[in-house]
Amino acid sequence: GKEDNIMKLNCKRIDFTYIPGEEIFNFPEESGLPFLFDVEEELTGDPAAMDAVGEMLDEAEKLAEKAKAAIKAALADEDSRYHSVVTFFMEFHRDDVGPDIVAELFPGTDPAKLSFAEMVDFLKLKRFGSLVDSEMNQQVFILDLSFNPEITDELMVIYFDLNKEIFCITHES
């Protein structure tokens, strides 16, 4: 049966097993990771793809920091193709949600003086996923960043390619 084919993920941070050809979808309490972890079934049957997952998973927080740096750069550059999407995301969470929520989302700050760049530091990695991008026809990695999922379900979603380069930043809710 399928259970005979259990594979161990090649990563340092957790001891994780999976069944090739079956989707991985794990909440933090299941995996021991501090974020949601998911991999499309198309990839779990491919050992090379899963090696890439393990390697990227070990560096997830580094990738999140790279994502935050990219968001800050896009905020500062009006010519960036991501400028409007990241600016709207920050504006929404500072100016549209109401002062009580702002105080909860950004504890210890003065919302009146809070810059968008400072807000980026409050983003936390909530999901690390991998799937096959249909347009590129290659494996990609997706990081969901959120301020506080208990308060807001708005996400900054950052797509990385196999070279750990960002090729898309979107806002999802």
Where are these predicted regions, by residue range?
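Long, contiguous N-terminal structural blocks used for assembly/anchoring
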Residues: 5-108
